């Protein structure tokens, strides 16, 4: 999130790139976002049939995170980033979100964060 303050009753969407984010950092992300508002939308994106996402398994249930299945369409290519970006834009233009949290170690989401900020919302 930016250093820009939002209301305590703000609606926040947390979008997790489970393919490229460590579940070890989830608690700290939830803590920071929880101080900024209410995390009403919690989604984790990935190909849940992969063993590499096993660490996310119990956390999704414990923290009411909706696992969003995205199969790999082509070998060696992940469609997860595209799915997450489309969902973020849908949420942005619906107008019911006051801020976003994007959890990923993938710099591919930088243009998405910039675009959301252009619309006046913190990321």
How would you describe each model-predicted region?
Residues 107-113:
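Acidic, divalent-metal-coordinating active-site segment for phosphoryl/phosphodiester hydrolysis
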């Amino acid at each position: 999130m930016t250093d820009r303050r939002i209301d305590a009753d703000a609606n926040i969407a947390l979008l997790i790139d489970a393919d490229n984010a460590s579940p070890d950092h989830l608690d700290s992300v939830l803590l920071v976002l929880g101080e900024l508002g209410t995390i009403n939308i919690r989604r984790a994106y990935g190909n849940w049939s992969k063993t590499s996402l096993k660490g996310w398994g119990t956390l999704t249930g414990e923290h009411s995170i909706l696992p969003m299945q995205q199969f790999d369409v082509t070998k060696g290519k992940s469609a997860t980033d595209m799915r997450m970006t489309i969902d973020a834009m849908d949420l942005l233009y619906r107008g019911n979100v006051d801020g976003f949290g994007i959890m990923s170690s993938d710099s591919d989401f930088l243009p998405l964060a910039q675009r959301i900020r252009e619309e006046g919302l913190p990321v």
